[in-house]
Amino acid sequence: MLKNKILTTTLSVSLLAPLANPLLENAKAANDTEDIGKGSDIEIIKRTEDKTSNKWGVTQNIQFDFVKDKKYNKDALILKMQGFISSRTTYYNYKKTNHVKAMRWPFQYNIGLKTNDKYVSLINYLPKNKIESTNVSQTLGYNIGGNFQSAPSLGGNGSFNYSKSISYTQQNYVSEVEQQNSKSVLWGVKANSFATESGQKSAFDSDLFVGYKPHSKDPRDYFVPDSELPPLVQSGFNPSFIATVSHEKGSSDTSEFEITYGRNMDVTHAIKRSTHYGNSYLDGHRVHNAFVNRNYTVKYEVNWKTHEIKVKGQN
């Protein structure tokens, strides 16, 4: 179901307006208008679009914040990419065998933004560097004149006319930028290492998630219980990423952006084997990137004059 929310914000002309309180950001987004200060040098016009695909198990919640700054010679747009990517973790008999069970799980979550418009350039994005912490919190701030800066966390010591924050959890995973240029950015949230009953294991360990019940007929029992799986494997991932783009004023009225959410899937096989003495045990075998780019891509059209957002296509 497509939702469209419109908010208009007028910001103070002061160059040192207080940093927006990120804890109030979501609550404010529910209002029709948001008054931050007097003056009209900067106007923030907001749109929100929601798109869901049951086929891909993905929901995109995209916030489009148009920055109308009289002291900046370009149009600017802040895109905050949120939503949910289901893990799609599944368990099954491998090729109808009785002694090999399979677990398909997300080794990597994909989040990407792309445009082919020659008048549009990517000027900033979050996160930028490889991040290994479980909880990720960063802020992108804007000051009059087209100055975008990032603060390290939600409590960053910055003073901005306007700011936008990201916050997400990635237990046992790491975030890094895989590709970036003037027209696109692609992040990968990748499995890293896991604490197990037998000690710390690499995400590439062939026995990762293999269980201890070789006599069960249920494929699920060949692998560790849900209580030993991190949220990004058991249920899914809630992304929160930001990209900022500029647009040449007086050029094109509209631009198109492709936003992609998805996953790369690994398959772990649990193989029932027997010792020389007849005792059964489970042996792991791993297929890395067995299914890649299982992605949901939505094409959004942005109108720089009317500030309308249209969905032009999806896979």
UniProtKB/Swiss-Prot annotation:
Sequence similarity: Belongs to the aerolysin family.
Keywords in alphabetical order: Cytolysis, Hemolysis, Secreted, Signal, Toxin, Virulence
Subunit structure: Toxicity requires sequential binding and synergistic association of a class S and a class F component which form heterooligomeric complexes. HlgB (class F) associates with either hlgA thus forming an AB toxin or with hlgC thus forming a CB toxin.
Tagged with keyword Signal: yes
GO biological process, one term: cytolysis in another organism
GO molecular function: toxin activity
Name under which the protein is recorded: Gamma-hemolysin component C
The keyword Lipoprotein is assigned to this record: no
Inducers of expression: Less protein is secreted in a secG or double secG/secY2 mutant (at protein level).
Highest taxon in the source lineage: Bacteria
